[in-house]
A protein has these predicted regions:
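Transmembrane alpha-helical segments in multi-pass inner-membrane proteins
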Residues: 224, 234-297
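Alpha-helical transmembrane segments within multi-pass membrane transporters and channels
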Residues: 90-130, 273-274
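Transmembrane helix-bundle core of multi-pass membrane transporters
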Residues: 118, 122-185, 212-215, 234-243, ...
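Helix-loop-helix "hairpin" substructures at the membrane interface of multi-pass membrane proteins
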Residues: 91-98, 107-111, 161-238
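Single transmembrane alpha-helix segments in multi-pass membrane proteins
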Residues: 23-89, 114-120, 254-265, 301
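Cytosolic-side transmembrane-helix boundaries in multi-pass membrane proteins
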Residues: 1-22, 204, 208-211, 285-334
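Hydrophobic core segments of alpha-helical transmembrane domains in multi-pass membrane transport
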Residues: 17-29, 58, 101, 130, ...
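Inter-helical junctions in multi-pass inner-membrane proteins, predominant
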Residues: 33-43, 140, 183, 189, ...
Length: 334
């Protein structure tokens, strides 16, 4: 009986986000008549596709024990740059998409290069670059909304396939499946876990730490670039405030999904559930007419709770390791 309780406890502990998501789905399903309709589910996924895709890149960074706070303003900067290239310069959509992804990759590589060369945590570097991109966004956009994006660009955010499935949802699901495979089943994925779990042990095992950091930065850049394409494609316009705060919403979902603050732990499947939990809560608060400022308070409480739970889990694991070491030493003495 105790073993069964222990197994259930481990199952819940390892899949907190999925259990929370199940509770939320049941709750909203009971009180909302059309919640389980195919159309509503597709709308929920398409509206939050940009958060889900951003979470893939940010998860890789956090898995390797990094933290990037510049994501929101990188998104807004790339959004207005992409819109300017489309509307003012008149470049084809395909060219602009490639340029946006390449520039975003370059930005993330620059952040990582500064972190390595200045021997600073990525968190500290991105606090500085976040401010730079904040100013750059307002300068480039002149604090104006850029409209009239071509239909070929809006395809990624607004169009449907098979009659009723948004392109953004299909793309999101494919990317999650592919990157989950990369993280869980490939040598590169194992190196990401090793880098976050114990960088010194990873170095002694022959892993090139700096090369891995650059690779992870490039992955984040690709997904943030794709993310911006979907976001402005869905909105049909770009504004200097778009994307701001995305990193905190995504990090809340990532922590809730089981990714540890110190890296080396977690799965993208849990992150997927964590982001959907935040999306459902936000949607529910909006439907209930809760003031946006109260929504910020709730999100902050959830983020704090998710971090607190992560710290509790880390402390418990550390204590268990210490206990096992002590038991092993006592066994040797005996």
């Amino acid at each position: 009986m105790n073993k069964r309780k222990l197994d259930i406890g481990k199952l819940i502990s390892a899949n907190v986000a999925w259990f929370v998501l199940l509770i939320l789905v049941l709750f909203f399903g009971i009180f909302s008549e059309n919640f389980f309709s195919f159309r509503n589910i597709m709308n929920l996924l398409s509206q939050n596709a940009y958060l889900l895709i951003a979470s893939i890149g940010i998860t890789f960074v956090m898995m390797s024990s990094g933290m990037d706070l510049s994501v929101g303003y990188v998104m807004s900067t790339m959004g207005v740059i992409g819109a300017k290239l489309l509307v003012d310069v008149g470049l084809p959509s395909a060219v602009v998409i490639v340029l946006m992804i390449l520039i975003t990759v370059a930005i993330e590589l620059l952040n990582t290069w500064l972190s390595i060369k200045l021997r600073l945590q990525l968190l500290v570097v991105t606090i500085a670059t976040m401010t730079i991109f904040q100013g750059a966004t307002y300068i480039i956009s002149e604090s104006k909304t850029i409209n009239n994006l071509p239909d070929s660009f809006k395809f990624w955010g607004q169009k449907y396939l098979f009659g009723s499935v948004p392109v953004s949802v299909i793309l999101t699901l494919i990317l999650f499946l592919v990157m989950s495979f990369v993280l869980n089943k490939t040598y590169f994925g194992r190196k990401v876990y090793a880098l976050g779990g114990n960088p010194e042990a990873a170095r002694l095992a022959g892993i090139n730490i700096n090369k891995m950091r650059y690779s992870i930065a490039a992955i984040e850049g690709v997904f943030i670039g794709i993310d911006v394409v979907l976001l402005i494609g869905r909105l049909g316009s770009a504004v200097s405030t778009m994307g701001v705060g995305t990193e905190f919403t995504v990090m809340t979902g990532i922590f809730l999904g089981g990714v540890s603050m110190r890296g080396g732990e977690g799965k993208l499947s849990g992150v997927f559930a964590g982001i959907l939990c935040i999306a459902l809560l936000t949607n529910g608060m909006q439907l209930a007419g809760i003031n946006i400022y109260y929504q910020y308070v709730v999100r902050g409480i959830i983020l704090l709770a998710a971090i607190g739970y992560d710290v509790y889990q880390m402390t418990r694991r550390d204590n268990m390791k210490k206990r096992k070491l002590e038991e092993a030493r006592e066994a040797k003495r005996a």
